[in-house]
């Protein structure tokens, strides 16, 4: 998937190719998941809750990020699209997440990313849980403004930044 990401960034592959590769990767990871011993690499890399914030029904990019993170060895809990803010916090508590990934594809849903971070603070979890944001309207400046730990422009970058933050 890393090579697919690189080729996509260079304009050598297009979104349908990336989606097919992600589907194949997901099928492969799922087929092998049961064969992996308990306490294997995925538990060592970190636990990530990933979803698209409330009001946004787009999930192609988020799904590709989830697949690539999982294939890189992270335990990923993809909680879907149009996810209420509180659900991110509840799932993070349930699985003892190290990081929450917040996707938004519409400018009108960007505030949901900020709201999750604020709720993490209210719940006393902000120092324990890293936050990565992404999506077409998201930027590094937005990440800085809302206090996210990082911004990833694409799935390959999301894997790199997750590895850096959770090392």
From Swiss-Prot:
GO cellular component terms attached to this protein's record: cytosol
Pathway(s) the chain acts in: One-carbon metabolism; methanogenesis from dimethylamine
InterPro entries hit by this protein: Cbl-bd_cap, Cobalamin-bd, Cobalamin-bd_sf, Corrinoid_p, Met_Synthase/Corrinoid, Meth_synthase_dom
Amino-acid positions noted as binding methylcob(III)alamin in the UniProt annotation, renumbered to this chain: 58
UniProt record, GO biological process: homocysteine metabolic process; methanogenesis; tetrahydrofolate metabolic process
Domain B12-binding N-terminal: from-to ranges: 1-44
Domain B12-binding: start-end pairs: 45-167
The entry's keywords: Cobalt, Metal-binding, Methanogenesis, Repeat
Keyword Membrane attributed: no
Domain of life: Archaea
GO MF annotation list: cobalamin binding; cobalt ion binding; methionine synthase activity
NCBIfam families in the record: pyl_corrinoid
Function: Acts as a methyl group carrier between MtbB and MtbA.
This protein's name: Dimethylamine corrinoid protein 3
